[in-house]
Regions:
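Non-catalytic C-terminal accessory modules of carbohydrate-active enzymes
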Residues: 230, 247-418, 423
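Active-site acid/base region of carbohydrate-active enzymes
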Residues: 31-97, 124-131, 137-150, 192-220, ...
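Predominantly extracellular/luminal regions of secreted and cell-surface proteins
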Residues: 416-450
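Aromatic-rich carbohydrate-recognition surfaces in CAZymes
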Residues: 1-75, 81-83, 95-103, 170, ...
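Aromatic, loop-rich ligand-recognition surfaces of beta-strand-rich domains
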Residues: 450-513, 518-559
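Solvent-exposed loop and edge beta-strand segments that line ligand/cofactor-binding
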Residues: 5-18, 84-101, 150-177, 220-241, ...
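Inter-helical turn/loop segments and adjacent helix faces that build the functional surface
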Residues: 28-40, 109-124, 251-259
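Catalytic cores of carbohydrate-active enzymes
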Residues: 54-66, 101-190, 204-205, 264-303, ...
Length: 559
């Protein structure tokens, strides 16, 4: 809800980058069945769709975009449009990506409009959907390359010609399958052989974004000081790998013409992708997904401080809808089709279980146990709804069962009375040291993370002396619990060795909570007390070894 509201009501969708947000709203509806939530922003969704007309070529009937604004700088179209000298900006192109996104968004708007009873809008966007499909198939499919490709949209460019197709395959050519835009025909399915070809898009450690025989494959153009910056002329990108694996899952799930790819290929590529999520070895092995990777070594390319904070994997969705095979539907049916190869295949799995998955207001579990020995629940594939088994088959394959929709569980949204939405207004923070306004504000800004590269929170001065942080609400409020978050790095910052919470009651400070021991480092410490009414609260802290204290967030609630 928060993300959708931000994109459609909070001003978050300025169309700076291409997106398939409307399709995501429909996809969310398929999972939770919440009709009201799905339709809440329909007028705004339609308005934003129409704003994309500025990137629509009314002669060619296709959308175009500068690759940078497709979040894919340094593509074939942008590099070639620069004469091979750059590629960060420029290179506008009719791309499989933006046209697939707009196809999916139009289809979602048609379905949502029909659900809302607006048949005219439903017909309008259904027609738009099919028009885009027709032009993508007619104009972006290359018989020569057997792949969906870009066409240049740049006019008056000395290096490329308007409407000319690009000269090499790119991974983006698989995105039409992500949204079932592609017909179930053998001529299109043959495109998937390039994903398996080491001389094309298949790297030893991941999917190349451009095939290896491109003239400027892996040429590094952009640097931040001595460090290479992000480019899409060959490196593996988790964001697009996710998209391609969703498309491949669609192909394997409900297409008859599969071309050369198999479920074994899917699992191998999924395992390959899984490996990119880890860095280090042995006891030092850790989850750490970065921006992009070298397709032959699997090592990060950019590796800047920001790189560890890219949230573009989509990995959970691949596991639940692909490997486990939960295929969300609008009706009261649960459909499961795990994309596992048969026993004996090197990529086969003998067992898995996905549990407590929310679906149409229920909690479902899907279990696969090839011989029944792992879970002791019987052999085969089974589905449970709210803890009760409702369907089973002895072998891998498609399994469906009726699931009566229920009201989704209410989301608990307690109000943090301490958050300072506007600097300088109540509630106001104050502190014993390091009283820079931004430093003080950071402890009550509502944001919570523990990343050393992105400091957030009030940081005290390093000192053995006691420290305090106080909040003035400007009026009496009722409080009954707190959540405290402290950062520790084993270096300059440590959690306090002692702490207590006080409130202004009857004109003086009175202790309302004195926990034992130290608070949690890089996590949440919960405090409770009998509800009190006060206008001021302060946290008293005793530093550990004279180290600084970073109070990442100080939250206070009524109950």
């Amino acid at each position: 809800d928060d993300y959708i509201d931000f994109m459609y009501a909070g001003g978050g969708n300025d169309r700076h980058f291409t997106d398939y947000m409307a399709d995501s709203v429909w996809g969310r509806y398929l999972v939770d069945g919440d009709r009201e939530a799905a339709l809440r922003h329909l007028p705004v969704m339609r308005h934003i769709y129409r704003l994309w007309d500025e990137k629509f070529d009314f002669d060619k009937r296709l959308y175009f975009v500068e690759p940078l604004l497709d979040a894919t700088e340094y593509t074939v179209s942008s590099i070639d449009a620069s004469g091979g000298k750059d590629g960060f900006r420029g290179g506008d192109a009719f791309r499989p990506s933006i046209n697939s996104y707009m196809f999916a968004n139009a289809r979602a708007l048609s379905r949502l409009a029909a659900m809302a009873g607006d048949e005219a809008m439903a017909r309008d966007y259904a027609a738009r959907t099919e028009a885009i499909r027709g032009h993508v198939l007619a104009d972006l499919w290359s018989e020569k390359l057997t792949h969906f490709i870009d066409r240049h949209q740049s006019r008056k460019n000395p290096h490329v010609t308007y409407w000319e197709p690009i000269r090499n395959r790119e991974l983006v050519g698989y995105l039409p399958w992500m949204f079932d835009l592609v017909p179930d025909e053998a001529r299109y399915a043959q495109a998937w052989r390039h994903l398996l070809d080491l001389a094309s898009l298949a790297g030893k450690a991941g999917m190349r974004t451009v095939e290896v025989n491109y003239e400027y494959y892996m040429r590094q153009y952009r640097y931040l000081g001595p460090d290479p910056e992000c480019q899409w002329n060959g490196p593996v990108w988790p964001y697009q790998t996710t998209q391609v694996l969703i498309g491949l899952a669609n192909l394997l799930d409900h297409y008859q013409s599969l071309g050369p790819v198999t479920r074994s290929d899917y699992m191998r590529l999924l395992r390959q992708y899984t490996a990119l999520h880890y860095q280090g070895a042995g006891k030092a092995k850790r989850l750490d997904l970065e921006e992009d990777y070298h397709p032959e070594t699997g090592q990060p390319i950019v590796g800047l401080e920001r790189s560890h904070h890219y949230f573009h994997s989509g990995y959970n969705d691949l596991i639940l809808t692909g490997l486990v095979g939960i295929r969300p539907r609008a009706d009261d049916v649960l459909e499961v089709n795990p994309l596992l190869p048969e026993a004996g295949d090197p990529q086969a799995l003998a067992w898995f279980r996905a549990q407590d998955v929310p679906y149409h207001g229920r909690r479902i579990a899907v279990t696969w146990d090839a011989d029944g020995s792992h879970y002791g629940r019987g052999k085969g594939l089974s589905i449970e709804v709210d803890g009760r088994e409702v369907a089973r088959r002895p072998t891998l394959g498609r399994l469906t069962t009726a699931v009566e929709s229920a009201r989704n569980a209410t989301i608990d949204r307690p109000i943090n009375r301490a958050v300072q939405l506007v600097r300088g207004q109540f509630p106001k923070g104050s502190a014993s040291s390091n009283t820079d306004p931004e430093n003080v504000h950071d402890a009550i800004d509502g944001r919570l993370w523990f990343f050393p590269e992105l400091p957030n929170g009030w940081s005290s001065a390093p000192s053995p002396a006691g420290q305090w942080y106080a909040i003035d609400f400007g009026k009496p409020v009722v409080l009954g619990r707190a959540e405290l978050a402290f950062f520790a790095d084993g270096k300059g910052f440590a959690v306090p060795r002692g702490y207590r919470l006080q409130a202004m009651i009857g004109g003086g400070w009175k202790t309302i909570a004195t926990p034992r021991g130290s608070p949690v480092a890089d996590g949440i410490t919960f405090l409770r007390w009998p509800a009190i009414r006060t206008d001021k609260v302060r946290l008293l802290m005793t530093p550990k070894g004279g180290k600084a204290i970073r109070l990442v967030e100080f939250k206070l609630f009524q109950d």
